[in-house]
Amino acid sequence: MRSKFKDEHPFEKRKAEAERIRQKYNDRIPVICEKVEKSDIATIDKKKYLVPADLTVGQFVYVIRKRIKLSPEKAIFIFVDEVLPPTAALMSSIYEEHKDEDGFLYITYSGENTFGEAL
């Protein structure tokens, strides 16, 4: 999936911002979180997150659920490189394995399991 954030910001600017963030907050991970285009789930109010390195994927999903005010009975799926990351995985390990060349970790979310494969 193409990232709107990447389309709106040139590579050099994104790379410089990610480097600045990592230097200033070395215990945090710069994350861009965007909705899967054709999903019927609510659109998130902000795309950029500074996530604690020791946060789990499950805890990050909880943050996203709160930001989009998703009711408990509704499902949400997050994807990294179009694959479902393990809920117990630390965001720091997902970042190290899947960070973009610009230094950000790109995560997409959907109300449906649109890709359907676990990491």
UniProtKB/Swiss-Prot annotation:
GO terms for biological process: autophagy; protein transport. A lipid is attached at G116 (Phosphatidylethanolamine amidated glycine). The keyword Metal-binding does not apply. SUPFAM superfamilies: Ubiquitin-like. The C-terminal Glu-117, Ala-118 and Leu-119 residues of ATG8 are removed by ATG4 to expose Gly-116 at the C-terminus. This Gly-116 forms then a thioester bond with ATG7 (E1-like activating enzyme) before being transferred to ATG3 (the specific E2 conjugating enzyme), in order to be finally amidated with phosphatidylethanolamine. This lipid modification anchors ATG8 to membranes and can be reversed by ATG4, releasing soluble ATG8. Pfam families: ATG8. One of its GO terms (cellular component) is autophagosome membrane. It is found in: Cytoplasmic vesicle, Cvt vesicle membrane; Cytoplasmic vesicle, Autophagosome membrane; Vacuole membrane. InterPro entries: Atg8-like, Ubiquitin-like_domsf. Residues 117-119 form a propeptide. CDD domains: Ubl_ATG8 (cd16128). It is a lipid-anchor. The record marks G116, E117 as: Cleavage. The keyword Transit peptide does not apply. Conjugation to phosphatidylethanolamine (PE) leads to homodimerization. Interacts with ATG1, ATG3, ATG4, ATG7 and ATG12. Ubiquitin-like modifier involved in cytoplasm to vacuole transport (Cvt) vesicles and autophagosome formation. With ATG4, mediates the delivery of the vesicles and autophagosomes to the vacuole via the microtubule cytoskeleton. Required for selective autophagic degradation of the nucleus (nucleophagy) as well as for mitophagy which contributes to regulate mitochondrial quantity and quality by eliminating the mitochondria to a basal level to fulfill cellular energy requirements and preventing excess ROS production. This is Autophagy-related protein 8. It comes from Cochliobolus heterostrophus (strain C5 / ATCC 48332 / race O) (Southern corn leaf blight fungus). The lineage of its organism: Eukaryota, Fungi, Dikarya, Ascomycota, Pezizomycotina.
